[in-house]
């Protein structure tokens, strides 16, 4: 039979005494590392303390009662102090003023309120679930637990002229009769609790408080003083005196071993609390002190997790910034240099149990300014040492991973580096040194292998570099770890990272011979190889001139006519041009060798037959380190800009004297490396006059040269253009450029120079959705010759490419095409981003300059625009331009979008809307858009957007337009113009007007020459018709003498233009036609002489304007035709969401604004928004799980506004918390059932 006697029913007090860990935590004393105050040092120190969590908690409950009274006193008597006394015997007293407890009897329970609060379980004033409450108490246990676990407990309350006294003993079982008396109403309200914890129950052998617990309580009271710095908190009559949270945070700043002090803590205080990051000079385990509403959460919680994530997010930002400079940090290790303090005031905080050791509810963090924290973290003094240790660690990992420093055998290298062809001999002899020839690609490797003799292969290995090498300046080992080419090269040489070499004797090869193409890309590869070795092993290069050597091959070979088999080789264009100037009448044929693949094997054998004759030895000195830093260090942007701005990209050539056997770093940088940089910029940055890049200019020139109105496949045209224009960079890139030049959707080209026949792309993906080049056709558009008149062609300066005249250095269109179509490009140290403007406005601007306005005046009237755009351009708060789409908001959350900023694709917009759908902002999207029109219906959650500014921002319907111009000036130098586009207008105006002057002079001269020929012809014909010439008896000599005698004009040193005419030329009909031609030519000369260059320009502009106006009319009509009618898309609008009316800015002073098509709308101040600023770390964060990735910005379109998304997750509460919450709601009804529910 089961023994029934083991089943017990305990009273609530007995349950607390028997199972205190459920209510106050463990009552066993344990060794716990924690912060305590060291009076000798005046600092917080991390020590292991003997802590009794139960004892700490019952003291804490009384302290929190006092702290809660701060909140209660806001509406009553102001609270000014909390006084705590701890006697040597262990008796504890907590006293505070403020609002106090009402000394009245409860009508329901017939007892005084203080008696209920301090002597009856589940009594509380915090059951109303006030959402704004910031008290710590929630469950109605609090001070009663302290009473139960004390041998004696007394309370004195003085409130509003009445004073209450009551005491309890025997663990709250025995109580005195409440004593209430009247006192002077002027006396301050006071609440005083005095108790003697049952130290024996807590396991203290001497029945008194220990020294460690005194220190723990001292620290706990300091936390309370820091939390409520406006209240005077005293311990044993000594105030702590924290004026601000900074005073408290400084206590955690500890000096280093050498006495050096760390920087001041980073402290930010907001309405809902304070957060501090206290730096330490040495690493330690992550240490976080968290306090919520005065509760010290010894086990952390959501607020501690969120505070650490703010720090880690700032460190992530720092890591990304440093990564650009090749520097690496371990954010986890750097975070260990900080002690984090987070003291919050929160409404209705929830904890995992009655002990309140861990916060589990959602928190609202102080919004830490991003810029301030980023700058603070970047200035930490320990970062440099940390980065050095990371470099050492990474070097060790790389040495281990890639096997550097090991003298691997050829057999081992066969499997390690498959592309390496190792020298057959393992050592040098007195005559030959082991040389590793590094080639640019496999074709150059083949040339070297096929050209080296068997004897040379004993001492020469060959290794091809494929792909692009990486810049490892500043010992960027993280980048090196991703560059397999350099790793294999170092392994082949036997180099070890971090080791200092003074001699190459211990390496596998004693020389590195770089063999690249003789073009700009070859120069770049040489520079990257030199940079890598000088950065990682500078001593190797400085002590061994020629360790890196450069192999020089001819760039031009000529065969001189008339001299049998005489071939002259030139290793530089400078030498070749010098020879041309010395032999102006020489007849020769030239072959150009810009790529090593052009050389035959026979020629390669010639190069290597006397190999040393073609080798230049590189000399490196210590001072060269700074120069290479300037070229390759990402921080030296301004130096590189100045360096390149002084050079001419279109006239410069590599100017190294190849006849010399030594090459200094200075000569290499300033004479060869700069050539690569300039060529790279020339490919990416447009010319100010024609707005074209070299590839675009080649395409235009070849298409004009083609003289065909028939369209051709893009794939076929690319081959033709490559051939006639000497294009050397692959037809794929050329095809892509052809496609882009033909795109004419809104946001593509305002003026398309080529006609798109087929799928050339659309607004769906901003042109990236075009068909393959083999399927689409193109030809010149009607705008090409309107902008680039044929009469201009003979007056342009053409480029000599390998002996053939190809495209002009730059065209001079009738309008600055750069402003019509805009330009985007990223070069070497320079970038450009110029928006497009309406071509008719650009034409109006040119006309205004012709009429005398300055470029500075005119440019103020130009507003960025895309032809066909149906939205508006509005002035921004910082005077910038903002392209704004168009929408209408209707009832029931329906929103119709009829235009997007032209730089936003439809696909990017849909992607952005999808991300909003995931956060339930958008509930449905219906897209009716086409190739060049926007027509999208949305259903948005009602109330999610309250103003038009929120609609534009959240839906990415506004886009800032940046102007940051860099162009090539007319003389070919790089010219940063920033946001001022007036130089473009002025440069174009000067060049175009000069061209008209020269064109007029040339046309008059040509007409006068034609007139002279016609008049000479008429004179000869009249002489013949008068019978003075007998053709039957005449000889060639007599006819020539007759022409000389008549004073006729010579053409091409003869008179064939007259004497080779047919007999019908002398008829009456031909004579009359000749007379008419003379009259017509005379009239043309007269008209042209009366026509000024300006009038010629205006005539060309009139033709263009008329054609473009018709083109724009048809384009806009086609866009509007595709859109659904307003009867379908319309409806009752929501006034608060209606976009502001168009209010135009006043025109620039003195400008004829009416002559411009596009006008900017003035800045509209957004209505008051409830959105929180986004330039901070922190804010509302989730209560469960990691929040480090919460709030990632949504990117709907390039440069679109971004919005934070916060994921909220359900918090899993502990069983104790659930019981406490339920018990608090139901008061005492379930108290007898607690043991059954728990166990």
UniProtKB/Swiss-Prot annotation:
Gene name of the encoded protein: TOP2
Domain Toprim, residue spans: 434-548
Matching InterPro entries: DNA_Topoisomerase_II (IPR050634), HATPase_C_sf (IPR036890), Ribosomal_Su5_D2-typ_SF (IPR020568), Ribsml_uS5_D2-typ_fold_subgr (IPR014721), Topo_IIA (IPR001241), Topo_IIA-like_dom_sf (IPR013760), Topo_IIA_A/C_ab (IPR013758), Topo_IIA_A_a_sf (IPR013757)
Main location: nucleus
A cellular-component GO term for this protein: kinetoplast
Family: Belongs to the type II topoisomerase family.
Name this polypeptide is given: DNA topoisomerase 2
Cofactors named for this entry: Mg(2+); Mn(2+); Ca(2+)
Residues in Topo IIA-type catalytic domain copies: 685-1101
């Amino acid at each position: 039979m089961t023994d029934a006697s083991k089943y017990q029913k305990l009273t609530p007090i007995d349950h607390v005494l028997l199972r205190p860990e459920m209510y106050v935590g463990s009552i066993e004393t344990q060794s716990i590392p924690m912060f305590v105050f060291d009076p000798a040092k005046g600092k917080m120190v991390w020590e292991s303390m003997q802590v009794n969590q139960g004892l700490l908690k019952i003291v804490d409950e009384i302290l929190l009662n006092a702290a809660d009274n701060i909140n209660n006193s806001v509406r009553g008597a102001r609270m000014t102090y909390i006084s705590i006394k701890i006697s040597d015997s262990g008796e504890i007293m907590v006293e505070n003023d403020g609002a106090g407890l009402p000394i009245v009897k409860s009508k329901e329970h017939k007892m005084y309120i203080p008696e209920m609060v301090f002597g009856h379980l589940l009594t509380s004033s915090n059951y109303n679930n006030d959402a704004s409450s910031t008290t710590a108490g929630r469950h109605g246990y609090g001070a009663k637990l302290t009473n139960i676990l004390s041998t004696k407990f007394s309370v004195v309350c003085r409130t509003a002229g009445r004073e209450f006294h009551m005491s309890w003993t025997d663990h709250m079982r025995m109580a005195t009769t409440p004593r209430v008396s009247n006192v002077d109403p002027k006396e301050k309200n006071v609440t005083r609790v005095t108790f003697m914890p049952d130290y024996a129950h807590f396991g203290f052998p001497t029945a008194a408080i220990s020294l460690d617990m005194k220190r723990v309580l001292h620290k706990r009271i300091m936390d309370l003083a820091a939390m409520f710095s406006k209240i005077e908190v005293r311990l044993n009559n000594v105030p702590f005196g924290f004026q601000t949270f900074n005073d408290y945070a400084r206590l955690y700043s500890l000096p280093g071993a050498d006495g050096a002090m760390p920087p001041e803590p980073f402290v930010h205080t907001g309405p809902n609390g304070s957060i501090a990051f206290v730096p330490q000079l040495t690493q330690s385990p992550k240490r976080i002190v968290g306090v919520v509403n005065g509760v010290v959460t010894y086990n952390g919680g959501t607020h501690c997790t969120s505070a650490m994530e703010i720090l880690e997010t700032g460190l992530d930002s720092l890591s990304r910034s440093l990564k650009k400079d090749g520097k690496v940090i371990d954010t986890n290790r750097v975070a260990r240099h900080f002690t984090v303090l987070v003291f919050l005031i929160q409404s209705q905080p929830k904890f995992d149990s009655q002990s309140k050791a861990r916060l589990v509810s959602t928190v609202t963090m102080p919004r830490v300014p991003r810029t301030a924290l980023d700058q603070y973290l970047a200035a930490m003094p320990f970062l440099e040492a940390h980065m050095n240790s990371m470099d050492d660690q990474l070097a060790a990992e790389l040495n281990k991973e890639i096997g550097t420093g090991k003298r691997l055998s050829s057999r081992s290298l066969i499997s390690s580096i498959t592309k390496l062809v190792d020298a057959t001999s393992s050592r040098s002899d007195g005559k030959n040194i082991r040389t590793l020839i590094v080639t640019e690609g496999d074709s150059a490797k083949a040339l070297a292998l096929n050209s080296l003799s068997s004897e040379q292969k004993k001492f020469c290995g060959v290794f091809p570099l494929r792909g692009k090498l990486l810049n490892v300046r500043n010992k960027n080992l993280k980048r090196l770890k991703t560059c397999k080419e350099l790793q294999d090269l170092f392994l082949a040489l036997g180099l070890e990272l971090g080791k200092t070499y003074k001699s190459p004797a211990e390496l596998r090869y004693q020389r590195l011979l770089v063999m690249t193409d003789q073009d700009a890309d070859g120069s770049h590869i040489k520079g990257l190889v030199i940079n890598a070795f000088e950065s990682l092993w500078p001593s190797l290069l400085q002590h061994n001139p020629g360790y890196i050597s450069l192999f020089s091959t001819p760039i031009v070979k000529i065969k001189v006519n008339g001299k049998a088999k005489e071939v002259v080789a030139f290793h530089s264009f400078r030498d070749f041009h010098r020879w041309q100037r010395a032999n102006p009448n020489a007849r020769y044929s030239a072959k150009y060798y810009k790529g090593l693949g052009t050389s035959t094997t026979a020629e390669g054998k010639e190069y290597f037959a006397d190999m040393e004759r073609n080798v230049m030895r590189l000399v490196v000195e210590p001072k060269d380190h700074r120069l290479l830093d300037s070229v390759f260090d990402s921080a030296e942007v301004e130096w590189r800009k100045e360096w390149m701005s002084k050079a001419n990209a279109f006239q410069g050539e590599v100017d190294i004297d190849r006849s010399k056997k030594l090459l200094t770093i200075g000569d290499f940088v300033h004479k060869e490396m700069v050539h690569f940089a300039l060529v790279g910029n020339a490919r990416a940055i447009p010319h100010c006059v024609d707005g074209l890049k070299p590839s675009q200019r080649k395409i235009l020139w070849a298409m004009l040269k083609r003289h065909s109105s028939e369209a051709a496949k893009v794939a076929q045209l690319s081959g033709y253009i490559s051939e006639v224009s000497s294009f050397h960079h692959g037809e794929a890139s050329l095809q892509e450029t052809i496609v882009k030049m033909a795109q004419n959707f809104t946001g593509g080209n305002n003026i398309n120079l080529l006609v798109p026949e087929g799928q050339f792309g659309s607004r769906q993906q901003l042109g990236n959705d075009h068909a393959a080049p083999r399927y689409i056709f193109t030809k010149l558009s009607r705008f090409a010759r309107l902008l680039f008149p044929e009469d201009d062609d003979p007056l342009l300066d053409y480029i000599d490419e390998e002996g053939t005249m190809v495209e002009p250095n730059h065209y001079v269109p009738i309008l600055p095409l750069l402003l019509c179509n805009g330009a985007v490009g990223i070069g070497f140290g320079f970038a450009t981003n110029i928006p497009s403007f309406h071509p008719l406005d650009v034409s109006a601007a040119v006309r205004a300059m012709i009429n005398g306005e300055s470029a500075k005046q005119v440019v103020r009237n130009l507003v960025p625009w895309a032809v066909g755009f149906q939205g508006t351009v509005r002035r921004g708060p910082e005077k910038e331009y903002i392209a704004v789409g168009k929408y209408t908001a209707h009832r029931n959350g329906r929103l119709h979008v009829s235009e997007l900023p032209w730089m936003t694709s439809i696909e990017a917009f849909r992607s952005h809307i999808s991300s909003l759908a995931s956060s339930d902002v958008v509930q449905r999207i219906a897209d009716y858009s086409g190739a060049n029109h926007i027509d999208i219906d949305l259903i948005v959650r009602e109330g999610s957007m309250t103003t038009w500014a929120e609609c534009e921002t959240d839906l990415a319907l506004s886009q800032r337009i940046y102007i940051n111009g860099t162009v090539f000036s007319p003389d070919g130098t790089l010219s940063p113009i920033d946001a001022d586009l007036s130089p473009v207008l002025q440069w174009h105006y000067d060049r175009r007007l000069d061209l008209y002057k020269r064109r007029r002079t040339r046309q008059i001269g040509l007409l006068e020459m034609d007139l002279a020929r016609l008049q000479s012809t008429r004179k000869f014909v009249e002489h013949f018709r008068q019978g003075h010439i007998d053709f039957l008896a005449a000889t060639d000599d007599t006819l020539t003498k007759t022409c000389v005698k008549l004073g006729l004009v010579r053409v091409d040193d003869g008179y064939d233009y007259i004497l080779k005419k047919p007999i019908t030329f002398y008829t009456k009909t031909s004579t009359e036609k000749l007379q008419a031609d003379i009259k017509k030519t005379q009239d043309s000369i007269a008209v042209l002489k009366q026509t000024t260059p300006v009038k010629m320009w205006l005539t060309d502009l009139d033709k263009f304007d008329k054609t473009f106006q018709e083109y724009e009319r048809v384009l806009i009509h086609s866009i509007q035709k595709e859109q659904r009618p307003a009867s379908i898309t319309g409806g009752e609008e929501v006034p608060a969401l209606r976009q502001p009316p168009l209010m135009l800015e006043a025109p620039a002073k003195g400008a004829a604004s009416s002559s411009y098509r596009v006008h900017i709308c003035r800045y509209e101040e957004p209505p008051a928004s409830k959105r929180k600023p986004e330039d901070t770390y922190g804010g509302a964060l989730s209560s469960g799980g990691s929040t480090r990735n919460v709030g990632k910005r949504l990117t709907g379109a390039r440069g679109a506004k971004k919005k934070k998304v916060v994921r909220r997750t359900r918090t899993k509460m502990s069983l104790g918390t659930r019981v406490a919450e339920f018990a608090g709601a139901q008061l005492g009804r379930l108290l007898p059932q607690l043991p059954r529910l728990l166990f």
